[in-house]
Curated annotation (Swiss-Prot):
Protein name, UniProt field: Uncharacterized protein YndB
CDD domains per record: SRPBCC_CalC_Aha1-like (cd07814)
Family listed: Belongs to the AHA1 family.
Source organism per UniProt: Bacillus subtilis (strain 168)
A Pfam family of this chain: AHSA1
Signal peptide (residue range): none
Source species, domain of life: Bacteria
Amino acid sequence: MAQNNENALPDITKSITLEAPIQKVWETVSTSEGIAKWFMPNDFQLKEGQEFHLQSPFGPSPCKVLAVQAPTELSFEWDTEGWVVTFQLEDLGEKTGFTLIHSGWKEPNEVIGKANEKSSVVRGKMDGGWTGIVNERLRKAVEE
């Protein structure tokens, strides 16, 4: 997603190849039960425009499904900071290419309300967090 502000922080992008067919990965990233296995408890429903909540460490985060292109792409607004999370899947036969994009970052010194920290600090923590979530938790959820 293009940044509106040239001083904004760059998107977080994580890409991996999963040892599972695309349909299994899609079910894991596009259902409430699947998302809860590797990300956060939620009341997600796969429907464009659907509002839902992720139960984050900072409390419930309001979200809204923006786009669904089964089984290759899902994007949603996350919380009230302007963030958008996108899951992109690529069919590689018995494997699946998976890319997560966390966009909508503000300027480095702008404070993120719930965390009460600068955007640059929150982005740094989330970048590391996404690495573990995608490389370990998502991989385990789809490859077991």
